[in-house]
Amino acid sequence: MTITDLVLILFIAALLAFAIYDQFIMPRRNGPTLLAIPLLRRGRIDSVIFVGLIVILIYNNVTNHGALITTWLLSALALMGFYIFWIRVPKIIFKQKGFFFANVWIEYSRIKAMNLSEDGVLVMQLEQRRLLIRVRNIDDLEKVYKLLVSTQ
């Protein structure tokens, strides 16, 4: 097994750990989930480039008669990338004392101001930064509003 294979195993393990955390661990942290809203995905061009480069590496490894384990590891990495970028749905998870946004816990007390932009983006102003929350379904913003009013 080469260093390349070890690095590929490390990247696959990191992506797998992220996927498990995102799907199974995060919804169970900090109490029961009150509301989970699917969000719009960010630009997919990055994911196309990533998976495309992995496919090029697989092709290059096969045509140069590279190690079979490397081909399988590259294929597993491409599948993990495909899952993370295209199948997994990003979401905001509301709990009793805060919410998870982009896998980061934010308490309700950190919210200084909230606005709704004209194009349906919920803007939350925190102490140091601004969160731009783009929901998939515009009707979900009413659910978020009702939840925030009831918890505050």
UniProtKB/Swiss-Prot annotation:
Annotated membrane topology is: Multi-pass membrane protein
Q: Where in the cell is it found?
A: Cell inner membrane
Gene Ontology cellular component terms for the protein in this record: plasma membrane
Keyword tags? Cell inner membrane, Cell membrane, Membrane, Transmembrane, Transmembrane helix
Q: Does the keyword Calcium apply?
A: no
Predominantly, its location class is membrane
Top-rank taxon of the source lineage equals: Bacteria
Please name the InterPro entries in this protein's record: DUF986
The keyword Cell inner membrane appears for this protein: yes
Q: Which residues form a coiled coil?
A: none
The UniProt entry's sequence similarity note says:
Belongs to the UPF0266 family.
UniProt cross-references to HAMAP family, sorted A to Z: UPF0266 (MF_01071)
Q: What is this protein called?
A: UPF0266 membrane protein YobD
Q: What is the lineage of its organism?
A: Bacteria, Pseudomonadati, Pseudomonadota, Gammaproteobacteria, Enterobacterales
